[in-house]
Amino acid sequence: MNPKIIFLDAVREHNPLIHNITNLVSAHFTANGLLALGASPMMAESPDEMAELATISSAVVLNLGTPSDEKVSAMLAAGMAANQAGVPVVLDPVAVGASHLRQKTVATLTQNIQFAAIRGNAGELAYLADVQWASKGVDAGQGSGNLAEIAQKVAQKFNTIAVLSGEHDFVANHDRVMKLSNGVALFPKVTATGCLLSAIVGAFLAVAPRELAFQAACEACTVYAIAGELAAVGLQATQSGTFAVRLLDALAAIDATQTEQLMKAEWII
């Protein structure tokens, strides 16, 4: 990873339109997080307008949180149209191991759409990598697999950038894995923080040339994690509500220099 943060300012300058087909739990928080960062959110879900909207979007983020037949149809239409338009598509396979419906949906999406990035927790990416893991609904659950290897297996299997988020984040492509160690324990205490990260990955990919997509994904994770650290200063473990509001403020205030000074990154592979 380049130690210089080069895409945060680009997000704010270009105000990319990020089309999210997301879940009812996270839509509001995701939209506000993108606005705070400097991107522009769109949360449309009708299959009938997906082809048109893909041509005006800067990135498309597909989130499996609350699937339905209509939403899955919209995801397919949006993702395929975005591929045709050269617009990056991000997949967030929420709780993919929890039900046959989610597993079937992810299989359909990955067979028909080329994803620029797949972002999930350890349990979700372990399922995609065919690694045994005891997931707990939308939570990561418990497992003993090598997280860097899981991320890289997903990257290689789907020819994508894999972002495995958790206490440490792992960003992988077909031959490299970066470990990112910023962040705070309050993140999992607020619903939709993972969903927002997927959308922020989309925003950074939207302003990055394809050959620098790996760098952009690493930057997205780092900026978000450090914003969380700044938001959590002085807070107790019981102040998750305050943290959620302060996280939006931190996303609006964080700058590249601050991020460069605080980031913790190392190559694993």
UniProtKB/Swiss-Prot annotation:
One of its GO terms (molecular function) is ATP binding. Pathway: Cofactor biosynthesis; thiamine diphosphate biosynthesis; 4-methyl-5-(2-phosphoethyl)-thiazole from 5-(2-hydroxyethyl)-4-methylthiazole: step 1/1. It comes from the Bacteria. Its cofactor is Mg(2+). SUPFAM superfamilies: Ribokinase-like. GO terms for biological process: thiamine biosynthetic process; thiamine diphosphate biosynthetic process. It catalyses: 5-(2-hydroxyethyl)-4-methylthiazole + ATP = 4-methyl-5-(2-phosphooxyethyl)-thiazole + ADP + H(+). Transmembrane segments: none annotated. Pfam families: HK. It is an enzyme of class 2 (transferase). Substrate binds at M43, A192. InterPro entries: Hyethyz_kinase, Ribokinase-like. Its EC number is 2.7.1.50. ATP binds at R119, S165. Keywords: ATP-binding, Kinase, Magnesium, Metal-binding, Nucleotide-binding, Thiamine biosynthesis, Transferase. Belongs to the Thz kinase family. Catalyzes the phosphorylation of the hydroxyl group of 4-methyl-5-beta-hydroxyethylthiazole (THZ). This is Hydroxyethylthiazole kinase. It comes from Glaesserella parasuis serovar 5 (strain SH0165). The gene is thiM.
